[in-house]
Every structure is written in C-alpha cells, then in structure tokens.
Regions:
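Conserved small-residue
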Residues: 132-184, 281-282, 628, 642-740, ...
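Extracytoplasmic gating/loop element in the C-terminal half of outer-membrane beta-barrel translocons
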Residues: 170, 294, 299-302, 319, ...
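Extracellular/periplasmic, surface-exposed regions of secreted and cell-surface proteins
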Residues: 23, 70, 254-273, 279-282, ...
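Outer-membrane beta-barrel proteins
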Residues: 78-122, 126, 144-148, 190-208, ...
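Glycine-rich, aromatic-lined ligand/substrate-binding cores of catalytic
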Residues: 739-772
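Short, small/polar-rich motifs associated with maturation and membrane association
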Residues: 1-251, 265, 723
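C-terminal extracellular loops and terminal segments
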Residues: 32-34, 622-631, 670-689, 735-747, ...
Length: 846
C-alpha cells in the first residue's frame, strides 16, 4: 500500500497486484507491454510498433479528465518518470492503487491512480548465495502488412478515377499492357514498397544474471541484464545507414543492513543505459511513403544500381533508408535511495521512526551521421520506331557522411522523507497501525532556472477488530510552487470501512465459502498534471504578428505585447471518488472472485477561457481557468480457478474492466445546434457528419439537401441533414463513433502442467473504441497516392452501386468525401492471443 505494508485480509482500500513472475511470461522490450489483460482496471493499448519507442499507452480506470490522464509510478516508494528504467526481471510485484484512501496520501498527485513497483530483495530465509542466469531469444513478426494494388491495376483504376472527374485518361493501352506483362521493369515499374524495405522478421534477445542471499547482518539482491531488439528494415550495414535497433543494460543492487537490533538501513541502486539507433528518415515518413507511393512511380534503382527519384517525389523510400545516414539516442537513468529505520519500542511497542532520501538522474543526448544521395530521374521518350523508351538523368550528388551532435536533456529529482510508523496488536483482538510522514521533493530540468518543488504532510490510521471489522482514515496536506501564493496547498481526506464476513461465527467454518469481505470507501484526491509552468501569471513578450505598421512605406515593427492574463485562482483538479468492493474465495481457496465498482466526480479541470472574452476587447489570447467537470464510473472484476486432477494441475480465469466517462460541465464556444456540444459526451468524442450512403444518380443529387462543400457527383458520399435546413454543412456534425480509448478491456489466462511440462496462454481483448481513417493512407490517388485492395474492391461504380462500400474513385482532394464523417470511423474491437509459452522445468536430482 502507499508508503507501507498491510495484511491483505485487514485492508479495506481497493488495489490489485501482480507478481514479477507473471510479468516475465511476456518477452517484451518495455515493461508496459507486459500489462495486457493481466491487471483489472488497467487498460494497455499499443500505439506504435517502433522498436525503442513501443511503450504501450496505459490508463488506470479509463479517462478521468479532459486534461492529462498520466499517473504516478513509484519504485520502492519513490516516484520515477516512467516504465522504461525498470525491467520485469528485477520486479517482485506491482500494486495498482485504485480508491481514495489508497491515493489520498499522494495528495494532488494521486488523482489518476498510482502504480507501486517493488523490486526484488534478499530475504532472511535465503541463506547462502543463490545465482540465477536467464536467457531468452525471440523472433518478432509483423502482425499485418497493408495490401495495395500493383501497377497494372493501379493504372487502370487511375484512368477510371480521371473519367469520374471528367478528365482524359493518363495511361494508354500500350502502357497498361506493359504494366500487365512486366517485361520491362525500368520502363514499366511495379514496385511493392513494403517488400522492398521490410524483412520477414526481427529478433529480440535478453539475458540476466542475478545474485541473491542473506546472513545475520545483510540481505542482498544484485542483478545485471542486457536486452537487444533489432527491427525489420532490409539492407542496412550499420555504418552508412541503420536498421532500427534498441539496446539496454539495466542493473540493480538492493541491500537491507541490520546495523543493530533496533536500527536497520535500506540501500538501493538501480538504473539503465540505453542506446537507440534508427534511419535518418523518420519512422512516420518512412511508413507513410511505403503506404502512399504508387507502384509505378519509378523503379527502385537504375540498371546501374543508382537510386531513382523525381522532381515531385525526390524521396525514394529505399534511398531514404540506405542513403541518408543514421541517428542515435543515448540515455541513462539512475535512481539511488537510502533509508534508516529505528525501532522506538522503548517509548511504546510497535513504534518506529524512519528517514530516507532518493536521488534520480536522467540524461539523453542525440548523435547522427547524415549525408545526401544522388538520385536519377526517369525520362520517358519515344524511340525511332515509336516505341516507349526510358533513360535516367542525374538530379543530385552523393555527399560524405557528416557528424551532428544533438543537444543534451537532463532531469534531476530529489526526495526527502521522514516519519513515524506504528503497528501493534492488543489482546489478540485489536490491531492498530498508523503512519505520520513528511516529504519534500524537487525536480530540476537542464536549461530551466525555476525548480519544481512540492511538500507533503500525510497521516494514516488503520484499525481492525478480530480481523472482522476494518477502518482506515487518511489525510494529506500537499502543496506545489506551481500555483500562486495563498493557493498552493490543499487538504485531501479519505476513509474506508470493511467487513470480513467469513470471520463471523456463522461463516467461519464454511467449507464452500472460505473468504468473504465487503469494503467501501470515499474521499478527495487531486491531479496537478496538465497545468503549464506558472500558468497563473501574466506574460509579456514579442508576439508573432502582434506588431504595428508605421510610415509611408508601411513598414512592420514587432511589438512588446501582453501574451497571457493573470489568474491567481488557478488550482489543481479535484476528484471525489467512491468505491465498493467484494472479495471472495471458494472451494478450499481454489476459486477466487473479486469485484469493484466505482464513481468519480472530477472538477476544476483546466480549460481555455477564450470563448468568454468578447472579440471587441481586442484580446487575442486566452488564460486557463478551472471550469470543466467529468464523471467517470465503471467496474472491474477478476476470476481465477486452480485445479488438480491426478498429476495434472491447471488454472483458468481472467479479468474484466469497464470505465465510462462523461463531460458534465464544459466551457465551449456557443454552437449553432444543441447536438454539437461536447458536454454530455465522453472525453475525446469525435464529431462529424452522418453518412447515409452514396448518391445514386443526378436525380438523387437534385432531390437531396445541398451539400455545401463542393459540387457532388454520383458515387459521392451523402449525408444526413440533422437540422432540417436543406443544407449539409458544419452545423450538421454530430457525435460519431467512440473515443480512441477503450471502455472495456479483458484478459483470459489458461495453463496446464504435467510432470515438469507446462503450457500457458494469455488472451486479451479491447472494445468500445474507434479509429478514424483521416489521411492520404486511406484516400486513393490524392497527391498520386496508392490504392489499397479494400478501396478498389468496394469502390462505387454505376454497375455495383448497390454493393459499394467506398466512394467513387477520384484524383482530387474531394472536400465532400474526405471530411470528418462516420464513414471513416472503424470499430477497433479486438481479441487476440497475446502470449503462448511451452516450457519444461528441470528438477535437480530427478
């Protein structure tokens, strides 16, 4: 639990825990990618597959706010910036704190949830030194490669699109035949850019060496690990260019030192050193070009092996990969902590005092070797016989590699803690424990003069009577220098109660129901993420396009102007959280079922006040104000069964989480129609037009509301007139689809073991969220883009108008079809096998 430990039976607050052993079942390069489907209430979603930058996006009980939904991550009691600096191999357990009593000790920092990461330590029973060596090697395969048309179909469909636009065909029958036969790949290229750039697989490997032991005076754990992840790009040599690569060395040394019977010391050191290397061209650009470059744009190389290109498209995707050089990022993160604990039994039994310090340093630096490559443009001509011919003209020159050293980025944190802990049982019936602590922390960033600083005073009392009736009360007083004087500190109270019904006499010896606990909690927590630095202050400076014109020549002069108004009432977000839970164990503890329900009312969310400033004031800037509110509610449960049949042991179970939010107060621009307001909808709800099909013919167009964006033709998207004014425009936009954060996530775990062999499977699923297809990747022929198989197969034509699933093809940036509408929204629900593991355990002496 927060800043301490409690007996789970006597805990009345809500939390979930997972062991490091469970996390290690997934071979991943970043810790967050091991969370999928494993922790109730925690949603993990992949946003990128780029090696070294593939951390999952994580939400704790969904979206709490329209601001920053980031949460606290603590390693051995002290905050860290993210998951990257720690690996599953060094983790003993992760605890997810959920309700107000569990979070209130963190004051204005705990509102979005807290993850407590506890690393491995030596244990008094470990005895002599134990050495552990682990090694794993894995192959990574691309889950899916988009499918696009080859040159013959591309050119044929491009002619169709031109005809739809009322324009003449671009490709002749001779050219179409050349693309179809593929006999001259330089004159009639047919390039699959994905196949030219991507390999069939990459690899990941990691190795760990650890030492663990204990004696009368010290318990210790020491670990060092190495991980390497190589990407999918072809043909790279590592000197003139580079595949995507990620290497990490991580280390940890934890020690508990028994100085005297009354005084113990805890010393921890952990960190990582990382190196990322990648092509000079950005990953986003690389993948966009692979998806949009036409297959007949030009061949990859000339007959002599030089890269090709053109004036309009000089960036040959393969040339960009192999000919521009490479970039790298070096980073390290080190956390060192020390804590002294002294028993004060001479004052009263169970009392102790402690003091601790934590230092954390993070550093990043960039380095690159860059160059330019020569490209040759294909020139198409007619030969003496009238046949099509091609030759290549050089348009640029090769350059040597040049070295670039990027700027440094460095952040340092320091935490100081001191406090008293109390833990005592009276007469076997009463258990009283408590905590009173003080903490201050500072964070400095290279290049910034002002230091981030916070102070915290917090207390907690826990009482249990005969392990049946439970009570917890928490309060903290927390402040930040990021707010105006007089408005920097806040009080965060919370309380919970619990009833262990299975310890009552009428259930105590029940053989079916072994454990039953009810609990409920309420309290106030805060969230100070999202506010910019000293946002309460007014700012003056040289504003862009804020100057004046003087003189007969009407010359422009910059001006020193006000850029932001002052708002000294600015404060943090506040959440009233209510939670109720049930924990059960059945059939000799073989079946476990836990469930929680929650309601959170978030207020004082920062929004822009621009909408409240009259335009005649001449003020062209805004000031953040605490005006928005969000309600978030949901449930989560876990179910697990462990069984044994002869020599076969097995388990089956899973987790389920649901979290839904609604904006209950907003500060938005007055809108033309009630259905256009964001209030009443979830955070991040997309808005757009409602598509009701395609125009069938000119008669259909004439008898439908006028679509004001551009003249339409048969096969264009047709939209619903929401307000009945017989015009389709921006005032007809309604809520479409769902936000991009899943409301529901679930996981299923299955396993079986027989005579040392074991098989384990993990499935995970996400649902109730959408993706919006909104760029050239999905718009055929716009800017000479490629066309996908699904667009070609579903395109509208007069012959298949009743079966069409895609608008008519066009070479224009059609402002009617390619605007925000539910036609481009896709349900992203998924269910997949996340992890499959087959193993055998060797037992010495057998």
């Amino acid at each position: 639990v927060a800043y301490g430990k409690q007996d789970r039976v006597e805990t009345s607050s809500a939390f979930s825990a997972i062991s490091g052993e469970e996390l290690r079942k997934s071979q991943v390069s970043t810790l967050s990618n091991a969370f999928f489907g494993r922790i109730p209430g925690l949603t993990a979603m992949s946003k990128s597959g780029e090696i070294g930058y593939d951390e999952a996006s994580v939400w704790l009980r969904g979206q709490h706010t329209s601001g920053d939904n980031g949460f606290m991550i603590l390693v051995n009691g002290y905050e860290v910036s993210g998951f990257n600096q720690i690996t599953a191999e060094e983790i003993e357990s992760i605890t997810y704190l959920k309700d107000a009593p569990a979070l209130a000790l963190y004051g204005m920092n705990g509102g979005n949830g807290v993850l407590l990461i506890t690393t491995k330590r030596g244990r008094p029973g470990d005895g002599k030194l134990k050495i552990s060596v682990t090694g794993r090697y894995g192959v990574q395969l691309p889950q899916y490669k988009p499918r696009f048309k080859g040159s013959y179909e591309y050119a044929t469909l491009y002619n169709e699109a031109l005809a739809n636009d009322g324009l003449p065909a671009q490709y002749t029958e001779r050219q179409l035949e050349g693309y179809r036969t593929g006999n001259n790949p330089y004159l009639y290229p047919d390039v699959n850019w994905y196949d030219e750039i991507l390999k069939s697989s990459g690899h990941i490997q990691d190795y760990t060496l650890s030492f663990r032991g204990a004696d009368r005076f010290v318990n210790y754990y020491v670990m060092a690990g190495f991980m390497e992840n190589k990407g999918l790009y072809k043909g790279t040599d590592g000197e003139n260019n580079s595949n995507i690569g990620f290497q990490r060395i991580n280390f940890r040394a934890n020690a508990d030192i028994y100085i005297t019977k009354m005084l113990t010391a805890q010393v921890d050191l952990g960190g990582r050193i990382e190196d990322r290397k990648f092509p000079q061209v950005g990953t986003g650009t690389m993948w966009k070009n692979m998806a949009t470059y036409a297959p007949n744009l030009y061949p990859v190389r000339t007959p002599e092996g030089y890269f090709t290109g053109s004036a309009k498209f000089p960036n040959n995707p393969v040339g960009n990969l192999l000919g521009l050089g490479w970039s790298s990022r070096h980073a390290y993160d080190v956390q060192a902590t020390a804590r002294l604990t002294h028993k004060l039994d001479f004052i009263t039994k169970g009392l102790s005092a402690y003091a601790g310090i934590a230092l954390n340093s993070s550093y990043q630096n960039g380095y690159a070797k860059t160059r330019q490559y020569a490209y040759y443009e294909p020139i198409y001509t007619k030969g003496e016989s009238g046949a099509d011919e091609v030759y290549f003209e050089k348009r640029s020159n090769d350059t040597d590699l040049s070295v670039w050293t990027g700027s440094d980025s460095e952040t340092s944190r320091m935490y100081l803690q001191a406090g008293f802990e109390y833990d005592r049982r009276f007469d076997g019936d009463h258990h009283l424990s408590g905590l009173l602590m003080y903490q201050q922390n500072t964070r400095s960033v290279l290049g910034q003069q002002a230091i981030y600083a916070q102070q915290l005073i917090a207390g907690r009392i826990n009482y249990a009577y005969r392990q049946k009736y439970l009570l917890e009360a928490v309060v903290s007083y927390n402040g930040s220098e990021n707010y105006a004087k007089g408005n920097r500190f806040g009080v965060f109270p919370a309380a919970s109660v619990g009833w262990v019904i299975s310890n009552e006499n009428f259930l105590k010896d029940n053989r079916t129901l072994n454990f039953l606990k009810l609990r409920a909690s309420a309290g106030l927590v805060g969230n100070n993420r999202g506010a910019s630095r000293f946002a309460y202050e007014q700012y003056w400076g040289i504003g862009a396009n804020k100057g004046y014109y003087y003189g007969t020549a009407v010359k422009y002069y910059d001006a020193f102007v006000q850029l932001a108004l002052s708002n000294e009432d600015l404060t943090w977000e506040k959440s009233a959280i209510y939670n109720a839970g049930l924990e059960t164990r059945w059939f000799g503890n073989r079946l476990a079922f836990d469930i929680d329900v929650f309601l959170e009312n978030r207020r004082d969310i920062l929004v822009d006040n621009r909408n409240s400033i009259p335009s005649f004031s001449g003020i062209g800037f805004s000031t953040p104000v605490n005006k928005a509110k969000v309600r978030n509610y949901g449930t989560e449960f876990s179910l697990m069964y462990y069984g044994q049949a002869a020599e076969v042991s097995y388990y089956a179970g899973g987790t389920f989480s649901f979290a839904r939010n609604k904006i209950t107060a907003s500060y938005e621009t007055p809108r033309a129609e009630p259905y256009m307001y964001r209030q009443g909808h979830p955070v991040g709800q997309p808005f757009g037009l409602e598509a009701i099909g395609f125009f069938r013919d000119e008669s259909d167009i004439e008898n439908s509301p006028r679509q004001a964006f551009t003249p339409v033709r048969p096969g264009d998207l047709k939209y619903r007139d929401q307000n009945g004014d017989n015009v389709i425009d921006a005032n007809d936009e309604v809520a479409i689809g769902r936000p991009t954060v899943p409301e529901i996530n679930y996981g299923i775990k299955l396993g079986v073991e027989y005579k040392g062999f074991d098989l384990q499977m993990l499935f995970d699923g996400l649902t109730n969220y959408s993706l919006y297809l909104n760029d050239y990747n999905f718009w055929p022929f716009v800017n000479n883009a490629n066309i996908s198989d699904w667009a070609a197969a579903g395109r509208w034509t007069p012959e298949n108008s009743a079966r069409a699933t895609f608008p008519r093809l066009t070479t224009q940036a059609n402002t009617n079809n390619y605007r925000s509408s539910d036609f481009w929204v896709r349900d992203m629900s998924l269910f997949r096998l996340r992890n499959l593991e087959l193993g055998y355990t060797f037992t010495p002496g057998k």
